[in-house]
C-alpha cells in the first residue's frame, strides 16, 4: 500500500495526507520516511488505536509532521488535503454513499488523489455479503469460538491470537458498498475521476476479493 501511495503523490513539496481508519498508524509511519516535507494526519474511530499511534509517535526521533486524532470521519472537519488514503474502511462506513463520496471530494484539493482499498462488486463478494448477514442474525458465543478455531487453522503462523480475535467481528459485518461501475459513477459525479486500479491478493478464502482504486479530484460533471 505504501508504494502505491508514493506512486501517486508528489514527494518534492509540502503536502497534506489524511489516513482514514489509520489504526495504530503503521502506514503513516512508513510514509513519513519517504515524504520528508509532508504533514501526515491519521484519524480512527477507536481511541485505543489512536493512543497506540501516539505512543509510537512519541518514541520517534522526529514527530512534528505526524498527527493522530480519534474521530468519526463523517463528523471530521479540517483544511483540504492533497491526498486521502483509506485501506479497507470505506465499504464498512454506514450511511448514504452519495454523502460520503461528496465529503471525500470536498476534503481534497483540486488535483488531489484518493487512494482507497475496497472489495470489488462481484459474485464472490456478493455471496460472502449474504453469508455475513446470515451469521450476524444468529451470532452467539459458540459461533465466535468456531470462527476463531477456523481462523487459527487458516492463518497458522501468520497472525497472533490477539489479531485473530479482533478479526472475528469482521465476519459479521457485510459491506455497505463495493467498487464497481455504479460506485465509480457516483465518484465521478462528485468530481473524482478513476485514474488507476491495482488488484490485491486475498490472505484467506473468507476475505472479500479487493483492490486499490486511485481517484483524482477534478471538475464536477454537470
Task: Put a short name on every predicted segment.
Residues 21-25:
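Class I SAM-dependent methyltransferase "Motif I" SAM/SAH-binding loop
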Residues 26-74:
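Class I SAM-dependent methyltransferase SAM/SAH-binding core
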Residues 76-84:
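A short acidic, Gly/Pro-enriched loop at the edge of an enzyme's catalytic core
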Residues 98-110:
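A short glycine-rich, Lys/Arg-flanked "PGG" loop and its adjoining helix->strand segment in the class I
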